Design a protein with these regions (language model features):
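Short acidic, flexible loop segments centered on an aromatic residue
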Residues: 157-177, 182-183
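Extracellular and select intracellular beta-sandwich modules with Ser/Thr-enriched
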Residues: 34, 238-243
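Solvent-exposed residues in well-ordered beta-strands and their adjoining turns
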Residues: 155-157, 171, 205-209, 248
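Secreted, periplasmic, or luminal enzymes acting at the cell surface/secretory milieu
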Residues: 2-163, 190, 224-225, 229-233, ...
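Short, surface-exposed ligand- or partner-binding patches at beta-edge/loop junctions that are enriched
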Residues: 205-236
Length: 269
């Protein structure tokens, strides 16, 4: 199955009926040559999904913020009334998800939602197959002031040459209690073309400020001091190795702008 698409689609009705899926995206006039190179084995794919493919459309939390149970004619008229209020019925009141939308996912967008709330997915963020396989070993985390340096050995354990994208996710201490995502992507790196049996040491760094989240009450970006878990992943759902490091606190004071003028029922863990 070749997917010439630009965003996630519903895969529940067919994914168990195909042997393999290649997401080609929309590569333009040269796309056919690239796909042929991958399918023939001339090129070993090493791409990773930049979004989550949910099983069904309605699995995404944002589904509830799109117009529903409205026929096309009425929906079209409603949108036109938004541009030309003189033609709208005099007693018409603004309707949610037609005239305005209050997005309530807050920080739980994409993999942060599916991961933090334990929702099954078809293909997780960061997922992508290769014609070879890779192993991970000797993960280390070294702290120097506000900088954490992460190193891991990546070995081609398969039978053909290939590149691998190493994804570094980080989990904050007490993430659920503090209403933070289960883990977040904080860096990534790609290996060179590794021959079968070849190993490369991949190095990535994370600053304390990279781990900050916004504290609304304090109007500040804050990183809490504590023990953070650094995870080497092959996708948001697949942790290959992990280690911990003690991170110092970090704060950057800012000021409120564009504060909502209505109370939002934001999603919380």
């Amino acid at each position: 199955m070749l997917l010439d698409i630009c965003s996630p689609i519903d895969v529940a009705s067919w994914q168990d009926q195909v042997d393999a899926v290649v997401c080609t995206w929309q590569g333009g006039q040269e796309s056919g040559f690239s796909v042929a190179d991958v399918l023939s084995g001339k090129v070993n794919p090493s791409g990773k999904l930049p979004m989550t493919f949910q099983i069904k459309y309605g699995d995404a939390y944002a589904d509830k913020f799109f117009p529903a149970n409205v026929d096309d004619k009425t929906l079209g008229a409603m949108f036109m009334w938004g541009y030309n209020k003189d033609k709208a019925p005099k007693d018409r009141q603004p309707q949610a998800n037609i005239d305005f939308t209050n997005y309530e996912e807050d920080i739980y967008v994409g993999y942060r939602y599916f991961d933090s709330f334990g929702k099954p997915v078809a293909y997780p963020f960061g997922f992508g197959l290769s014609y070879t396989t890779f192993g991970y070993d000797n993960l280390t985390c070294t702290v120097d002031g506000d900088l954490v340096t992460v190193k891991v050995d990546v070995k081609n354990t398969g039978k053909c040459a290939g590149r691998n994208v190493v994804e570094l996710f980080v989990a904050a201490p007490n993430s659920k209690k503090l209403n933070k995502p289960e883990k977040e992507l904080r860096n990534y790196a790609k290996t060179c073309l590794l021959q079968p049996g070849q190993t490369e040491t991949v190095t990535m760094t994370v600053k304390a400020e990279d781990l900050a989240s916004f504290n609304e009450k304090a109007s500040a970006w804050k990183t809490d001091a504590g023990i953070y878990t650094f995870m080497i992943c092959s996708s948001a759902s697949d942790v290959e190795a992990q280690a911990t490091a003690k991170v110092k606190a970090w704060t950057k004071k800012v000021h409120n702008v564009m504060k909502p003028n209505v109370k939002l029922n934001l999603l919380r863990r």
